Swiss-Prot record:
Disordered, as annotated region: 137-170
Domain of life: Bacteria
Residue spans of biased composition, Basic and acidic residues class: 148-170
A GO biological process held by the record: urea metabolic process
Protein name, per record: Urease accessory protein UreE
Protein family (similarity comment): Belongs to the UreE family.
SMART domains linked to this entry: UreE_N (SM00988)
Annotated source species: Pseudoalteromonas translucida (strain TAC 125)
Lineage of origin: Bacteria, Pseudomonadati, Pseudomonadota, Gammaproteobacteria, Alteromonadales
């Protein structure tokens, strides 16, 4: 088994030995056992930290370089007009603390992608989005504080309320 222990810069001159294709729920973990695209057994032994992104590179303790690929998985893609409609949909979905991927397709249509969820889908339709259910890589936004160190993290707490009248603190 190859022990993948180090994240490396994507500008490395080393050849990629193999690719590890994982869905989002596994790319957030620092410890797991998996099988690469070419059938090699690997174990991830990474410090907690950033999510593994499509194209990230990892080095095995024996020196080989492995590329990470985001697996196709069930997603809902909400297509919506740019500008205020897009901002409004991002705001309302983000207020529900759901992971979101945001992008533009080859035809210039703006989209928001999230794991299938009938409540979120109803909200997106209510706000003017057209939905597509399909298989695609899910690589959500990392969040505003994802690159901050421990000392710089979003450490203060705050409260907010929702339309149904309940509140909670963070």
């Amino acid at each position: 088994m190859f022990e993948l222990t180090k994240r490396i810069d994507s500008n490395t001159q080393d050849a990629v030995f193999d690719t590890l294709t994982l869905p989002y729920e596994l790319r957030i973990r620092g410890r797991l056992k998996a099988v690469t695209d070419n059938g090699h057994d690997v174990g991830l032994f990474l410090d907690r930290g950033p999510v593994l992104r499509n194209g990230d590179l990892l080095r095995a303790s024996s020196g080989e370089v492995f590329s990470i690929s985001a697996a196709d998985e069930p997603v809902t893609t909400a297509y919506i007009e740019n500008g205020l409609p897009l901002a409004r949909l991002c705001y309302h979905l983000g207020n529900r603390h759901v992971s979101l991927a945001i992008g533009v397709d080859a035809d210039g249509r703006h989209w928001i992608r999230f794991p299938p969820d009938h409540v979120l889908e109803e909200l997106a339709i209510l706000l003017g989005a057209q939905l597509t259910h399909h298989q695609a890589p899910f690589d959500p936004e990392s969040g505003a504080y994802a690159h901050a160190g421990r000392e710089q993290s979003h450490a203060h707490s705050h409260e907010h309320s929702h339309a149904d009248g309940h509140t909670h603190a963070h």
